[in-house]
Amino acid sequence: MSTQETTEGAPGARDVRLVAPGFAELTIRPEDGCRISSLIINDLEVLRQGDRYGSFPMAPWCGRIELGQFRSFVTAPGGGDEAGRSGGVRHQMPINATPHAIHGTVRDQPWRTATVDDQSATFYCDLTDPWPYRGRVTQTFELTDDALTLTMGVESRGDSFPAQAGWHPWFLRQLGPTGAPVQIAFDPAWQEERGVDHLPTGRRVEPGPGPWDDCFGMPDGVDVTLTWPTQLELTITSGAQWVVVYDEQEEAVCVEPQSGPPNGLNTVPRLVTPIDPLEVSTTWRWKRF
């Protein structure tokens, strides 16, 4: 492991690097939302570079929340939220993907380092405003010669609340200037029908061909393989049952394992309680050709 001062992002931020010598190098930026800024496998960078890219954690929700609002049947600390007509308390998150709120809050927060060694590291951040409930999110990285395992936990530090967790990696479409475009292979059980507002309608339909900006159900766990012909194969697995696949950008594709679908805080809420935290993990396993 090494740390290094960097002039990008937050002033004084330190990168954390995990190394499997001769095989892989992972760079994490704790003060920039605990984002992975680089994953190099056998001298090939596989993630799109830039402040918005790499791979970032999504919590306490994934994807879009309709109009930035969700309801909870637990009173928020400090009050001040409106009671909805259909019951519960309505909370308003900041709109950052008009007219919705997208991808959670922790990607915009600095994280603290808990433990670091040569090939693993753990970080955490506390849930704060605008999220109305006290809690903590923890993320662990474990690097080996042929795999990276990410684990994220969301825990309550007070009242119970609905939550989701997942990851949003931006994989390069081509590895190097002469590489062939990546191929995406997966076999979902269904596709969440997407409305004109980019939210699932609630209907499950037969999976269709790309290009995609869509959520898919994989009840036996996420299993998606990316293949860069003659260069690299990378398989993304997770016990999570939903994955968003986005391949509409020329430079990169996204495969996002997550614990629930977009707008899931409203449609399929998973309650985090003081005795029942949410935990999700994903493993990216690779082999060179």
Regions of interest found by a model, annotated:
Residues 68-70, 138-140, 268-273:
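Beta-strand-rich interaction surfaces with strong enrichment in secreted/lumenal proteins
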Residues 71-77, 114-120, 142-147, 175-179, ...:
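A short, structured loop/turn motif at beta-sheet edges
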Residues 226-262:
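Glycine-rich active-site loops that engage anionic ligands at enzyme catalytic sites
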Residues 256-289:
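C-terminal structured interaction module
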Residues 125-169, 174:
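Acidic, contiguous internal or C-terminal segments within carbohydrate-active enzymes
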Residues 158-162, 169-239:
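Active-site/ligand-binding surface loops and adjacent short beta/alpha elements
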Residues 1-89, 220-239, 276-289:
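Beta-strand-rich N-terminal accessory domains
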Residues 1, 8-10, 81, 95-144:
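Extended, loop-rich substrate-binding clefts of extracytoplasmic carbohydrate-active enzymes
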